[in-house]
């Protein structure tokens, strides 16, 4: 994600995934799944590392983290994030595998862009993902964690989610530029599949 010259890396690709991580300079990293206690990018003091619950502000961007306590354990922490950037409200559901608690849902008002897992087990199943989209009613919903060439872990094709949601607006693109004025009147939710 980029706002001007400021770049945020969301859920960096692990080398064990079988995928090649993109190479670019970033200013902040947000991880929705962290070991506990958290491990940060060693030797990269200028990088902003975000982990866990709380309110953060960097480069005029407001971020709130909500720990998914029913899915966290002694050794790892799952967090859902709400980010306000350039007047647009984003929500990153990350590695969740079940519906969100009422407490977290209450903190996610006015979501413009929802980024959510859509590849099924071990994360959120497609039916629950569709229910969450209908509850949150974002202007844009972006599926993640689905099957792509080279991925070593189990995941289902994004087509399974697309069949489940039966959306009238679906866009496939390599890169997405979002401006507040362009999405203000977007209804129903537009599904955007980022391709690699």
Where are the model-predicted features located?
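Pre-active-site segment of Zn-dependent metallo-hydrolases
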Residues: 2-49, 67-76, 96-107
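Active-site-proximal beta-strand elements of phosphoester/diester hydrolases
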Residues: 7-11, 62-69, 80, 89-95, ...
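Conserved acidic residues
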Residues: 25-27, 112, 139
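Ligand-binding grooves and catalytic loops that recognize ribose/phosphate and carbohydrate rings
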Residues: 34-45, 132, 136, 153-170
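Metallo-beta-lactamase
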Residues: 38-79, 83-87, 169-179, 184
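Active-site-proximal loop/helix segments of hydrolase catalytic cores
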Residues: 72-136
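Binuclear metal-ion centers of metallo-dependent hydrolases, dominated by the metallo-beta-lactamase
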Residues: 75, 140-196
């Amino acid at each position: 994600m980029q706002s001007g010259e400021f770049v945020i890396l969301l859920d960096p690709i692990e080398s064990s995934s079988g995928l090649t991580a993109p190479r670019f300079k970033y200013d902040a990293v947000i991880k929705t799944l962290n070991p506990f206690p958290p491990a940060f990018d060693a030797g990269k003091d200028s990088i902003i590392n975000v982990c866990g619950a709380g309110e953060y502000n960097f480069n005029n961007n407001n971020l709130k983290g909500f720990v998914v306590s029913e899915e966290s354990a002694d050794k790892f922490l799952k967090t859902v994030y709400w980010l306000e950037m350039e007047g647009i409200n984003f929500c990153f559901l990350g590695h969740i595998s079940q519906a969100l608690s009422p407490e977290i849902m209450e903190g996610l008002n006015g979501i413009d862009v929802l980024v959510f897992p859509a590849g099924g087990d071990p994360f959120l199943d497609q039916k629950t993902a569709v229910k969450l989209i209908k509850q949150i009613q974002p202007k844009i919903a972006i599926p993640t964690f689905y099957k792509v060439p080279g991925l070593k872990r189990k995941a289902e094709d994004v087509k399974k989610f697309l069949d489940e949601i039966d959306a009238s607006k679906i866009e496939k693109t390599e890169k997405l530029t979002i401006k507040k004025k362009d999405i203000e009147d977007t209804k129903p939710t537009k599904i955007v599949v980022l391709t690699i």
